[in-house]
């Protein structure tokens, strides 16, 4: 059995050992961590082992090589700024002299500015500079010909008038026109006034026509003269040669008999229209109990009596109506 060496001899042998192999270093790792004497030389010994292993492993191509660890290089700040101080200050002056067009408030109040030469404001009247014009830095087009303010105002007024005239065509048809409009617009009838909602009143450029009683001169009324005769059918006959005339009122207007006609004469039979005229007539009325009739009114405000001659009649006699005939209502329409 081999005799074991004391611990002191083993420690001395380990400190003086020339074994630089990776196995020896690994076997002594526990001892290096527990022995204080070994810790001091472990760093230097490890560097030597790495350099030796690198030299040995360089000859073998199949062995994996550890990457070399290089120390971080820290460059001082003084070496980073390679430009000298004089050059830095001169470039700052050249750069900021363009902006020294106002006095520095801090330098004017306290006599000291923390920015020193880097300040963009002037430190005193000697550094104060006049601002340069824009033409020196930027190329500008030649100045345009200036016009008088009055001519420009006239152009603006013309543009406004054109825009307002184009907008007025679509805004409202009853808008009050200007003086340059023709008088043809006055001949048109205001439809808003007929509906009763014209907001322009007398200032409207369209005609405000009051709805008055219009009478059709081609209308003829056929009715029984008295209650003694059998009740025939009353017709409102409109002659076909005047059918193109439009009567804008829903109810027909009847004509009064002439004043020179004989009162109380029987209603002539020949005045009843023929069959073809009845087919061309517009409405047909049933015999109802009348209460009032419309009568035309002349310029003096008095009822005006008129006469109508039926061209289809065989004789030349006039139509005769009894007293109070036109004070009764018209007959109802048979639908």
Curated annotation (Swiss-Prot):
It is found in: Nucleus; Cytoplasm; Cytoplasm, Cytoskeleton, Microtubule organizing center, Centrosome; Cytoplasm, Cytoskeleton, Spindle. Residues 130-156 have a biased composition (Basic and acidic residues). Residues 288-291 are annotated as: Required for inhibition of Ser-2 phosphorylation. PROSITE patterns: ZF_C3H1 (PS50103). It comes from the Eukaryota. Changing residue 68 to R: Abolishes pie-1 sumoylation, reduces the sumoylation of hda-1, reduces interaction of hda-1 with mep-1, reduces fertility, reduces embryonic viability and increases histone acetylation in gonads. GO terms for molecular function: DNA binding; mRNA 3'-UTR binding; zinc ion binding. Residues 158-167, 177-187 have a biased composition (Polar residues). The keyword Repressor applies. Interacts with hda-1, let-418 and mep-1. Interacts (via C terminus) with cit-1.1 (via C terminus). This is Pharynx and intestine in excess protein 1. It comes from Caenorhabditis elegans. The gene is pie-1.
